[in-house]
Amino acid sequence: SATREALSALKAMGLVEMKQGEGTFVKQFEAEQLIFPLSIAILMNKQDISHLLEVRKIIETGTAASAANNRNTEDLAIMAEALEEMKQAGPSDEELGEKADLKFHLALSAASRNPILSTLLDQVSELMVETMRETRRIWFFSKQTTIEKLYQEHLQIYQAIVEKDEEKARKTMISHIENVENILKKYFHEAIDKQ
């Protein structure tokens, strides 16, 4: 229901706490803790996120394969820099981690040398940032994965592109996006069960 989805969005933002058998309670917070834009509430609809992840699978798997064929040393340097920033950010600097994550995906897009793919990715990049942010928050706070696992997934994509292995690039990208999808589905399932 719409109420459950709204409560799930508020929970993900850290604004409410759900206690099984007791109810939903507004948490005390400082203004600086409210780090998510209001648009995240729109994305907290399970179906919307599912659709966005499907779009990402379609666009980014092809982008990764194309990048493996068309990348140059400058592209690899930007991807490597994004990976290093991601590694340095760790769980302590969420904002840097998010920026590095997006930088990596946009570098893949540029490496494809396909302006239409790049434009499509740019069109969904704002929504991607929101789901990346949400996924990172869920991952880190639910202990369902670690920053190292997220880094390793990106590193595998990068290595496939370095090797110019189109099929491996496609497979590692789809694996990464499916892992994101599974974590978000599990989160939504748990959030609904607790209500």
What are these regions (language model features)?
Residues 52-135, 153-159, 168-180:
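Conserved amphipathic alpha-helical segments that form helical-bundle/coiled-coil interaction surfaces
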Residues 93, 145-146:
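Short coil/turn linker motifs that delimit alpha-helical repeat modules in TPR/alpha-solenoid proteins
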Residues 136-145:
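Short helix-coil transition/hinge motifs at the ends and kinks of transmembrane helices
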